[in-house]
């Protein structure tokens, strides 16, 4: 019997956001799970900050809590990027996904409200953020035997 491995939901979520035209129109492909040393703004980071995995009966369903941050030069752009990411996740992120290096099935997304402000580490950059729970489980094996 082989182990059931849950998908890397942070990688799945960031790949999904990069695939959305409305997001890429604002940030190109700058949706990260780890921020680069050399940053070009605006940009987005998806970071797992908690959550649970449904392991009581079967190791199958992951319910990670993510913090999604968007940085930009102005508060207006930071809000637009943040709300665009939130809307894309809540309205579209459901179903079977296969991106390079990561696959999974997203069953639901619950997102919190947006917090606005300036980043204490990047005081000249505006930041918007929200939290979201992305319910996901492994994608079905699409290979034939």
Q: Where on the chain are the PLM-derived regions?
A:
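Small/polar-rich, solvent-exposed N-terminal microdomains that initiate assembly or binding
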Residues: 1-58, 92-103, 144-145
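Charge-dense, low-complexity intrinsically disordered segments
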Residues: 3-7, 72, 122
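Short, low-complexity, polar/charged sequence segments that are solvent-exposed and flexible
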Residues: 50-53, 63-67, 87-90
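Oligomerization/assembly interface segments of phage tail-like spikes and tubes
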Residues: 60-78, 85, 126-138
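Short C-terminal domain-edge/linker segments immediately following a structured domain
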Residues: 74-81, 97-102
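Short, hydrophobic/π-rich interface segment
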Residues: 80-93
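Acidic-leaning, charged glycine-interspersed low-complexity segments
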Residues: 90-145
